[in-house]
A protein has these predicted regions:
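Claisen-condensing/thiolase-fold acyl-transfer catalytic domains that form or cleave C-C bonds
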Residues: 1-113
Length: 113
């Protein structure tokens, strides 16, 4: 969890995803799908452009405007959508939170033995 200045609310996912990728020594090209909570469509566009997320990897099943924005359950909704993407190995769930805060979580599919 990291953030930006509060006046730039909505783009908190940018430093959060960048920090996560650097920590794991990955690039956005190593990620198969990104679920970015869509409180506002302009926020998703700004974050997508700054992170260089290919459109075919971003909110593959629609964003929160299309699928719903459950108060207090956005993170669970993002992760659930990612878990149903059974053919994607590495995925990220990220969201901007009030005051410029952003968080991001990386998931890697485990196929077992």
């Amino acid at each position: 969890t990291v953030g930006v200045q509060p006046q730039y609310l909505g783009v908190g996912p940018v430093p959060a995803v960048n920090q996560l990728l650097a920590q794991e020594r990955l690039t956005i090209n190593d990620i198969n799908a990104v679920e970015l909570n869509e409180a506002f469509s302009s926020q998703v566009i700004a974050s997508q452009q700054q992170l260089n997320i290919p459109l075919n990897k971003l909110n593959c099943w629609g964003g929160a405007i299309a699928t719903g924005h459950p108060y207090g359950a956005s993170g669970a909704a993002l992760v659930t959508r990612l878990f149903y993407m059974k053919h994607q190995f590495r995925t990220i769930a990220t969201m901007g939170i009030g005051g410029g805060i952003g968080n991001a979580a990386l998931f890697e599919r485990w196929y077992g033995n």
